[in-house]
Swiss-Prot record:
The keyword Isomerase does not apply. May act as an adapter to facilitate the interaction of SnRK1 complex with effector proteins, conferring tissue- and stimulus-type specific differences in the SnRK1 regulation pathway. Residues 113-122 have a biased composition (Basic and acidic residues). Keywords: Metal-binding, Zinc, Zinc-finger. The gene is FLZ2. GO terms for biological process: response to glucose; response to mannose; response to starvation; response to sucrose. Belongs to the FLZ family. Residues 113-159 are annotated as: Disordered. This is FCS-Like Zinc finger 2.
Length: 159
């Protein structure tokens, strides 16, 4: 039977911030408190930066989570995506593509039209680029081939 060694709660040596793969799989992370000089606490954050869940295998990094610091981003259902009007108060919310809220069908339709126009423009741009690429490829593959230049065949007499 294998006995796993646990790190002491207070670490005397310097921590490089890396967690081994086996520690991540086991759900172990760096301790949240270190035995640093008191001046370090005033200049650096000393909380646990990351947590991995052994059940889900997901890894959450609190360094990029603003809600951890008390000033989180507003919930995505707080305002209309297009006109930024406040949502809620038992009014209907019109969703588009699963995660985009709108205050009315009109705002939702406007966004749908914008997205369709954008997709159409990208599609045209892509097809024009492909056509130019094919044109360039065919012209460079046979340089001696006639390029529809007008010329006459026959005898030329020069004096």
């Amino acid at each position: 039977m294998e006995v796993s060694m646990r790190k002491p709660y207070f670490i005397e040596e310097e921590d490089d911030g890396f967690v081994s793969l086996s520690e991540m799989e086991a759900g172990v992370s760096s301790p949240s408190c270190y035995n640093y000089p008191q001046s370090y606490y005033y200049n650096h954050h000393h909380h646990q930066y990351s947590v991995s869940s052994p059940r889900s295998g997901k890894f959450h990094d609190f360094r990029f989570d603003n809600s951890y610091y008390g000033y989180g981003q507003p919930h995505f259902l707080d305002s209309c995506f297009l006109c930024k009007k406040r949502l809620g108060d038992n009014r209907d919310i019109f969703m588009y593509r699963g995660d985009t809220p709108f205050c009315s069908e009109e705002c939702r339709e406007e966004q749908i039209e914008r997205d369709e126009a954008k997709e159409k423009k990208q599609s045209l741009s892509t097809s024009v680029k492909a056509m130019r690429r094919n044109e360039k490829r065919s012209s460079s593959s046979s340089p001696t081939r006639s390029r529809n230049y007008a010329f006459r065949t026959g005898t030329v007499a020069a004096a």
